[in-house]
Amino acid sequence: MISYIIKRDGRRESFDLDKIANAVFRAAQSVGGTDAAMARDVAEKTCALYEQLHGSQEPTVEEIQDLVEKELIECGHAQTAKAYILYRYERTRDREVKSNLMKIMNELTFDSAKDSDIKRENANIDGDTAMGTMLKYGSSAAKEFYEMRVLKPEHAKAHRNGDIHIHDLDFLTLTTTCCQIDLIQLFQHGFSTGHGFLREPNDISSYSALACIAIQSNQNDQHGGQSVPNFDYAMAGGVKKTYRKRYLQNVARALELLTDIEEPQAFVKSYAAAIQQETGLIPCLANNNGYQEAEAQKLSERLTADQIATIQAFAKKNAYRETNRATYQAMEALIHNLNTMNSRAGAQVPFSSINYGMDTSPEGRMVMRNVMLATEAGLGNGETPIFPIQIFRVKEGVSFNPGDPNYDLYRLAIRTSAKRLFPNFSFVDAPFNKKYYKEGHPETEIAYMGCRTRVIGNVYDPTREVCPRRGNLSFTSINLPRIAIKAKGDIGWFFEELERLCNLVHDQLLERLEIISNKKVYKFP
């Protein structure tokens, strides 16, 4: 008579025949069975068989379950046996999940990052901090759950064995990877972060701050990097607004010093609004749009030609200097913010990239020059800023050759990159980029993601082959070195195995696409 049983964890417990009978009956019920007596009979025969084989030796749980399967099959209960085997497998899998997860939790809780691979797997997260550890708790639990409950067994097995690597498995059912954020469109009428609405910015410092907020906010909706495809064009709008404001302020200052006009600020505001309403003109960095002539005509009613020339020269000089300084400070703030502001549970900074290089306007050039100078200067103690990753676009006729309008910026980019690793360079004239480029359409200029991939082709609709507002679903890598090693020089086998894994990954990514395609808009505020 069996008195004790050895549990999987080594504990010794009293043997209970009813537990075996109940498990068999549940399996029978799952396939339509209703005979509890049959379940009891199988349990008794199992015990008798064990005693016959092993005598008084105490059984393990696994040994009893093996004999239950054998007895069910021999007694002609094939369907119940199949259900019992499935039930046993699911229980085993649940135990494995719990066991693996507990080991991971133990490592995260008690080991430091220097001793834990799990805590170090993302260089952008400090695994020793409270929020870093908390993030890893959630990430580790999600990975275990998805591997055991969501992924198809063949996909999970290939990932677990290292034949493929499903990137960001912890976000499998939650969100997409990365996005090219179109700041021009975003800033036109303001935008919401999900927690409040932000008005359209009206100064380069506001443009810089809201760019960081947009990147940070979107980072909380995605698991990959965030990129701005048109940083120079987008920030140029902020420089334009800043110059206009500073120019009019300096005209008012000069009027106050050199004339007897009362309320000079109100006077300047009034005639500037009239000029804009009548002609659409505003002060601009290039001073080539006719605004100064229109302004001189308005001022001539109160001032002499010499006074007007002096005031305008003073305003231009100081407005340029102040705007340039404000732009440098805005770019400096952007770099410092993107290396210090937190996202994702407060555990990491946004993985950010900015693309620039093609804007030849004075405003765009001022942005590019100052973001590179701020990068070259480094962070507070001179450290090299890791973010944003910067990509400088190079093109003949724009920046590649001496005499090109942005050639000086190209040289500055090379100098900055030599010291600070960034910017990287993308070549618009490269054949695989040039075929998409349409002059006069900045949206067709190649841009790279926060994750350093490029998305511009569009098989579904070739008329929409653009960069802004595009993104990636996700990635899965294939372990090519392993295939090569296993091939042992057999090229044919290598390509057969590669094709098999390509098809496997294709199916896995389509499954992930189907999952994410069912998400609701409200889940991405």
Residue ranges and their predicted role:
Residues 90-94, 100-525:
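Conserved catalytic cores of very large enzyme subunits
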